[in-house]
């Protein structure tokens, strides 16, 4: 039971307490490019979770036989392997989404979260905790992207997951010249950073200890 609780802690800490985009401010560059729709955000979150979890597991598994002098090169090779696997998987089964994400799946290898978890956690703990930490970090990254993408897609396109949420009848037309119009700002890249900044601010307020009066 104690072991199970310990394993669960690795996962939950990475998911919320040590959330990489909100607390460590890592992996935020992709928030600019892949959060215009919920579909792309979900896909990127899944891809990063897979790569981070699996690469952390393998790095931990090989930690005792990996020479210190080449450990970062070895970690990059391991990460590259899983990035190639997820990239080929998306191209084979979800080609449209893969085409939309373009080079950003391949650029997961440069994501600070993946290397950060391998270097700071996976090479110091056993494989199962390393995997849970990597998976939690990836999912923590993913839910932040999804939250941003929901707002951007809703107000930028009037849809969520491609389904119409804001009725067409509310939009500006010849019959309704003063109707609703999509917020063009939400489609632009800077909106992702504004929304991420607001999320970081809210999380810091929630996490901040209450001052004693």
Swiss-Prot record:
It is a multi-pass membrane protein. GO terms for cellular component: plasma membrane. Its EC number is 7.2.1.1. It comes from the Bacteria. The chain crosses the membrane at residues 22-42, 43-63, 77-97, 101-121, 131-151, 183-203. It holds the Pfam family Rnf-Nqr. One of its GO terms (molecular function) is oxidoreductase activity, acting on NAD(P)H, quinone or similar compound as acceptor. It catalyses: a ubiquinone + n Na(+)(in) + NADH + H(+) = a ubiquinol + n Na(+)(out) + NAD(+). InterPro entries: NqrD (IPR011292), NqrDE/RnfAE (IPR003667). Keywords: Cell inner membrane, Cell membrane, Ion transport, Membrane, NAD, Sodium, Sodium transport, Translocase, Transmembrane, Transmembrane helix, Transport, Ubiquinone. Belongs to the NqrDE/RnfAE family. NQR complex catalyzes the reduction of ubiquinone-1 to ubiquinol by two successive reactions, coupled with the transport of Na(+) ions from the cytoplasm to the periplasm. NqrA to NqrE are probably involved in the second step, the conversion of ubisemiquinone to ubiquinol. This is Na(+)-translocating NADH-quinone reductase subunit D. The lineage of its organism: Bacteria, Pseudomonadati, Chlamydiota, Chlamydiia, Chlamydiales. The gene is nqrD.
């Amino acid at each position: 039971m104690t072991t199970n609780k310990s394993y669960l802690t690795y996962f939950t800490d990475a998911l919320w307490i040590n959330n990489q985009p909100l607390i460590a401010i890592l992996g935020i560059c992709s928030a600019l490019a892949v959060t215009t729709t919920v579909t792309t955000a979900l896909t990127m979150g899944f891809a990063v979770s897979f790569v981070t979890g699996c690469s952390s597991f393998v790095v931990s598994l090989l930690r005792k036989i990996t020479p210190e002098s080449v450990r970062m090169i070895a970690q990059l090779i391991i990460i590259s392997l899983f990035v190639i696997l997820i990239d080929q998987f998306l191209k084979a089964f979800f080609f449209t989404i893969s085409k939309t994400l373009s080079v950003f799946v391949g650029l997961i290898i440069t994501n600070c979260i993946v290397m950060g978890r391998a270097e700071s956690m996976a090479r110091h703990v056993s494989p199962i905790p390393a995997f849970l930490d990597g998976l939690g970090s990836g999912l923590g990254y993913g839910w932040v992207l999804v939250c941003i993408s929901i707002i951007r897609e809703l107000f930028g396109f009037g849809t969520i997951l491609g389904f119409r949420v804001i009725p067409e009848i509310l939009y500006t037309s010849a019959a309704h010249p003063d109707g609703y119009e999509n917020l063009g700002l939400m489609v632009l890249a800077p909106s992702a950073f504004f929304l991420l900044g607001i999320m970081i601010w809210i999380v810091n307020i929630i996490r901040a200890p209450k001052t004693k009066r």
